[in-house]
Structures are given as C-alpha cells and as structure tokens.
Regions:
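Long, contiguous binding/interaction regions
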Residues: 1-169
Length: 169
C-alpha cells in the first residue's frame, strides 16, 4: 500500500492478459496493503497468479513490512468467489489448484480457508492469521497448523498465503 512504484511493478503480470480483467488495484497506506481484484476465466487467472506471486516474492520482504491490518504473507489471501455461473465447488477446486501450484513453484506454505478449508479451525481467516507473520514461524510447527500445501516452515521473506473459496463480502 505505500510504495506506488513497487505496486506498479508487482501488478504488471496481471495487465492486458487474455481471459480476465484487472478490475482494480486499491492501495491503502495505513494498512500498507493493496487489494487487487481480477474478474474472468478462472484458468486464465490461475495462470497469471503464478508470475504475479513470483513478482511479489522479488519485491516484498515481510521481515521489514508493517501496517495496521493483520497479515501473514506478502500475498495475504487469494479468495475465489463464485459469480457468473461458477459454483462454490468450482471455487474450492480453483483454490486447491492455485494453492498447490504456488507451493510447488515457490515453496510458500498454503492454508486453505473458508469453504475450501479442510479443517474446521481453518474456516475463519482471522483464526489462521492469529499471530501474524511474526508468530507464524512457530505456529506452523504445531501439528494442528501444518499447512495444506507445503512444509511446516514459513517462506523466510514471503510468509504464507491463505487461499480460499467464499461468497462476496
């Protein structure tokens, strides 16, 4: 949210792509986070999320990031929301696919949340986020907080990502 040139570089992999639109990029300086909204073909979005996460990994070090909003990773959450004929079941499948791919590509641990959660304690995002990036280093080592994808060890500069399927807020 505070570094506009960095935000421009990070969202570049999402611009002018076939199959989806980059609907909004909303930086918030107080929270020091940026909400990015994509709308379109889920498979196209998933393909674009991989280089996007790679760019975020290059640009953001969570060890020096601070802001008012609770956070656990440089890309904090990736929610899939059923609209335009997509079902919640579709969104759960997309969440699982993108979570597995991001973990495979970048060794970033993934927690599935909301409708995609595999455990009841992971349905609510604030429960997963509790302790934030700094506390996640120890939390992830507990058996009950082992990630859905990846090792029980946070990415040293990126943290972890919550990937979910949920209805619009």
């Amino acid at each position: 949210g505070r570094y506009l040139e960095k935000i421009k570089r990070i969202v570049e992999p999402l611009k002018n792509k076939e199959g989806f639109n980059l609907v909004s990029v909303e930086p918030d300086g107080d929270y020091n986070r940026t909400v990015v909204t994509l709308l379109g073909d889920p498979k196209s979005i998933i393909e674009a999320l991989i280089p996007f996460v790679g760019k975020v990994e290059e640009e953001i070090d969570m060890n020096v990031q601070s802001g008012e909003h609770p956070r656990m990773g440089a890309v904090d959450v990736i929610p899939f929301i059923p609209i335009e004929g997509a079902t919640m079941e579709d969104c759960v499948a997309y969440a699982e696919e993108v979570g597995e791919r991001i973990n495979t590509e970048f060794s970033i641990p993934i927690f599935l949340y909301a409708e995609a959660a595999r455990q009841k304690r992971r349905v609510k995002l604030p429960t997963i986020r509790k302790g934030e990036f700094e506390g996640m280093k120890e939390k992830i080592k507990e058996d009950k907080w082992a990630p859905d994808f990846g090792k029980a060890e946070i990415h040293p500069t990126f943290g972890v990502i919550g990937v979910g399927a949920r209805n619009p807020l």
